[in-house]
């Protein structure tokens, strides 16, 4: 049947799909709007599947809270341009709200949660991939339960690429808690304390330090026991750089973070810091290769 402009406009407003896609959907379904929506979804899912092997290393990190929990999550896109899109930001906020209302512990459980539309988070992300034209994925999330007598705080950097959630045993002034979250965002500690650093990591770092020492002319000819102490000192310094309680507190450098926490009579229970794309290897292509790929060459 002939498809008129009004039907195309109506379908486009409902689905946010492209004009030509809406026209094809209506032609394929004899002008039936509901069937056309299904047709677009089915074809959208097919398109989204083709994008599943792309690398999504951009995106947004977000920490959010309600009366009972704090959630911190990272949702990835392929480009920074999409990550700044208002619809993408709203999608992440919706996902955060669904996670806050849940007790999900794993990524699999999170993706299976139902949204207000009745679709799962995974289905919503697949639909977003089809509509936006980029691979969109929930990479990770952490839920922290609030408990009476404890202090939770969160920090979202203005660039939307770094978020932090902290949970303290004991009562901490909100300004101090927020400043500590900003410290974590800026200094990116990997562990709460040196005691939490895995033995394998320590051994690997010590091996690297030994190899570096062999190339350092200042250390040549040192007695073995003296050299060993120097190397242990270097290891301790390196480990303290990635241990939160051993870092100098950026807000007041007269304290280490651990000393500051002791002065406030609180203990850090949970520390979660997400930075968009950390640990993801980005694919870099030159312009000619990108054009060739799009042309199927």
Curated annotation (Swiss-Prot):
| CDD domains for the chain | UBA_EF-Ts (cd14275)
GO cellular component annotations, sorted alphabetically?
cytoplasm
Which SUPFAM superfamilies does the protein's record reference? Elongation factor Ts (EF-Ts), dimerisation domain, UBA-like
Give the intrachain disulfide bonds. Answer: none
| GO MF annotations in UniProt | translation elongation factor activity
Q: Which UniProt keywords apply?
A: Cytoplasm, Elongation factor, Protein biosynthesis
Q: What's this protein's function?
A: Associates with the EF-Tu.GDP complex and induces the exchange of GDP to GTP. It remains bound to the aminoacyl-tRNA.EF-Tu.GTP complex up to the GTP hydrolysis stage on the ribosome.
For this chain, the family text in UniProt reads:
Belongs to the EF-Ts family.
Its protein name is Elongation factor Ts
Origin species, per record, is Mesoplasma florum (strain ATCC 33453 / NBRC 100688 / NCTC 11704 / L1)
Lineage of the organism: Bacteria, Bacillati, Mycoplasmatota, Mollicutes, Entomoplasmatales
Which gene codes for it?
Answer: tsf
């Amino acid at each position: 049947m002939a498809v008129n402009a009004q039907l195309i406009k109506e379908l486009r407003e409902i689905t946010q799909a492209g004009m030509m896609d809406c026209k094809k959907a209506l032609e394929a379904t004899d002008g039936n709007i509901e069937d056309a929506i299904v047709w677009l979804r089915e074809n959208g899912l097919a398109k989204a599947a083709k994008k599943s092997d792309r690398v999504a290393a951009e995106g947004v990190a977000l920490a959010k809270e309600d009366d009972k929990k704090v959630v911190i999550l990272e949702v990835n896109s392929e480009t920074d341009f999409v990550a700044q899109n208002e619809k993408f930001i709203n999608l992440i906020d919706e996902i955060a709200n669904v996670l806050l209302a849940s007790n999900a512990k794993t990524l699999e459980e999170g993706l299976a949660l139902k949204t207000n539309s009745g679709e799962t988070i995974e289905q919503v992300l697949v639909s977003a991939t089809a509509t936006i034209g980029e691979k969109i994925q929930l990479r990770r999330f952490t839920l922290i339960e609030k408990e009476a007598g404890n202090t939770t705080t969160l920090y979202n950097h203005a660039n939307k690429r770094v978020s932090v959630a902290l949970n303290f045993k004991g009562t901490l002034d909100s300004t101090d808690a927020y400043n500590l979250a900003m410290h974590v965002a800026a200094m990116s500690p990997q562990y709460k304390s040196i005691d939490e650093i895995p033995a394998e990591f320590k051994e690997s770092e010590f091996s690297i330090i030994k190899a570096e020492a062999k190339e350092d002319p200042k250390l040549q000819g040192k007695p073995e026991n003296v050299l060993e102490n120097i190397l242990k000192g270097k290891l301790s310094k390196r480990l303290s750089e990635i241990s939160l309680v051993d870092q100098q507190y950026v807000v007041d450098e007269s304290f280490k973070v651990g000393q500051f926490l002791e002065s406030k009579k609180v203990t850090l229970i949970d520390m979660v810091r997400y930075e968009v794309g950390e640990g993801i290897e980005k694919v870099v292509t030159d312009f000619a290769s990108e054009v060739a790929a799009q042309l199927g060459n």
